[in-house]
Structure formats: C-alpha cells, structure tokens
C-alpha cells in the first residue's frame, strides 16, 4: 500500500490522538507532495474538506460509503478521496449502527497545469466533472485520474483552515433531511437526538483547507 494511502485506513485514523491535527497533516502532505494525473495532464489540489463519521464523532454530514482507503468515491456533492469505510447495508439504503466508520476528503478545487496558463476549477462539481468527464464504455479505461506523489515539494501557502462550505445552522431540519435521504429508518429512537447534538458540534468545524491564501 502506498504510504499516504495507509494514512487513510481505519487503523491509522483510530490511532490518531488528535483528529483535527491529523486532518491538517494530511492536507499539508496532499498539497505539497501529490498531484492528480490524468493522462499527460497534471492537476494540483487547491481546496479540500475533511469528513469522518463513527460512534465517537457522529459527523452526520458525511456521506455513508463502503470503500477501501484511497478509492475515489462519488456522491451528490462531487468526489472524495475515501478513507477506509464501512457501513451496514441491509436494504436499499445504509443502516446506521455503532460499528459504522466512514469518511473522506472532498475535492473542492483543482488547478490544471497548462503551459499556456493554468486553469482553476473552483467548486466540487466543476472539479469532479473536469476529472471524470467521460470514459469509454466498451474498452479498457485509459487516462483514469490517479493520485501521484512528486519528488519535490509543491507551493503551499498554508492559510488557516476554514469552516466547511455552506453547512446550515438548523440542526433538526438538516439531520432529518440527511436521515430521510441517505439511511434506512433508525433502530434507536434516541440516536436522532444524539445526531442533532453532534451536528451542532461539528457544523462549524474548520475542516476546509486551501493551497493559497487568497
């Protein structure tokens, strides 16, 4: 397993003494030492957000998933570099249980490196559509985007982290919507109250990182 990929496993995330500091270290390594390679074209990450849900930190805004560490995970908001993730799925939708553990790094912005002038794709859907616009439905996929480590550190201005984009304060309404759209009915009627309290705890966490200060 690639060294950075190993840092996205459940074991590594559970071992982190301070998850906030761990997110910051992952962001720094991604910005400085990784590019997204698509064929002959390189993209620098410019804007990312972190999401992680498990029993001890119920950040319910996180999309549920079953993924290996480092997989691309597509969802209605764009694409994540996934953490190793598990959630039970016994029906059409996932079921929230105490052993659920899932999350990832949302790609919010990328910078296409071009000799004629770099092009910025600012926004998670713009970034996703640029990277994963089209691929052959019948032949082996060529030029599929992948994370590649570079030898020399890339520019990283290390601005202060920010609140994640566009999260709403109305906890009851937001949590109800998330549960209705993404999960089977809760088995524990008290869990919703816990999720609402957790949403209030996490909605303004500074888990958004940018490459540049501007």
Outline where the language-model segments fall.
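A cross-family signal for N-terminal binding/gating loops and helix N-caps
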Residues: 1-214
């Amino acid at each position: 397993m690639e060294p950075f990929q190993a840092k996205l496993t459940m074991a590594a995330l559970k071992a982190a003494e301070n998850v906030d500091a761990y997110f910051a270290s992952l962001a720094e390594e991604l910005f400085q030492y990784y590019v997204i390679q698509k064929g002959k074209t390189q993209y620098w990450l410019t804007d990312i957000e972190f999401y992680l849900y498990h029993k001890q930190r119920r950040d319910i805004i996180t999309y549920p998933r079953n993924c290996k560490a480092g997989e691309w995970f597509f969802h209605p908001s764009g694409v994540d570099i996934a953490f190793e993730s598990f959630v039970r799925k016994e029906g059409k939708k996932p079921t929230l249980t105490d052993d659920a553990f899932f999350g990832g790094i949302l790609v919010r912005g990328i910078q296409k490196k071009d000799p004629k002038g770099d092009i910025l794709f600012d926004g998670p859907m713009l970034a996703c559509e640029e990277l994963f616009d089209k691929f052959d439905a019948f032949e082996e996929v060529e030029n599929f985007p992948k994370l590649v480590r570079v030898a020399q550190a890339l520019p990283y201005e290390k601005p202060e982290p920010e609140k994640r984009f566009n999260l709403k304060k109305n906890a009851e309404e937001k949590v109800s919507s998330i549960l209705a759209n993404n999960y089977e009915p809760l088995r524990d009627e008290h869990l919703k109250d816990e999720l609402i309290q957790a949403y209030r705890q996490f909605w303004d966490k500074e888990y958004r990182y940018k490459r540049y200060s501007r």
